[in-house]
Design a protein with these regions (language model features):
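Flexible, glycine-/basic-rich loop-and-beta segments that form/coincide
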Residues: 1-29
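A short, well-structured juxtamembrane/interface segment
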Residues: 29-47
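Glycine-rich adenosine-cofactor-binding loop
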Residues: 44-65
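Flexible loop/turn segments at secondary-structure boundaries
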Residues: 60-62, 84-85, 119-120, 143-144
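Substrate-recognition/cap helix-loop segment adjacent to the acidic, metal-dependent catalytic center
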Residues: 62-75
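NAD(P)-binding Rossmann-fold cofactor-contacting core
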Residues: 74-88
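Phosphate-bearing ligand-interacting subdomains
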Residues: 92-144
Length: 144
């Protein structure tokens, strides 16, 4: 192997990537994140509030499935892509509808499934007239 490959392998080793403990800690952080999200969503539902999801990326489906979040918790997923509208989220079977619906319905909360671009999505939806609050699911679920 080249010197660069050896350097990268050493960096990985020094970063703990070959240690079971690293992955055990990661697993616990992921579990904790899941429980905090579910706790937040359940408390919102107990208040009688409506929650929808915003965006239908693949990572959003992973989150919904891992947390067992379905149509009992999320009314629908608002999406811009015409390819996805009229379909359902894989595994959790939440209907995917045109994003325009959120401006008519004005649900209380929108769970951002494209949380990595929240800083782009939130201002655009507010500018278009969405009055609800936003739930950022990870790394720690919180409302903005």
């Amino acid at each position: 192997t080249s010197a660069r490959v050896k350097e990268l392998l050493l960096l990985e080793q020094n970063s703990g990537l070959y240690s079971k403990e690293t992955y055990d800690k990661f697993k616990e952080r992921v579990r904790e994140s899941k429980f905090k999200l579910l706790e937040l969503l359940r408390s919102i539902k107990r208040e009688g509030k409506r929650i929808i999801a915003i965006g239908a990326p693949a990572k959003g489906s992973t989150l919904l499935n891992y947390c067992s979040i379905g149509p009992d918790m999320i009314d629908y997923v608002a999406e811009r892509s015409t390819f996805k509208i009229g379909r359902y989220t894989p595994g959790t079977h939440i209907p995917i509808v045109d994003e325009a619906r959120i401006f008519e319905d004005q649900p209380d909360y929108g769970l951002l499934l494209s949380w990595n671009i929240a800083d782009i999505i939130i201002p655009k939806l507010k500018e278009k007239g969405f009055n609800g609050k936003f739930i950022i699911p990870v790394p720690t679920a919180h409302v903005v």
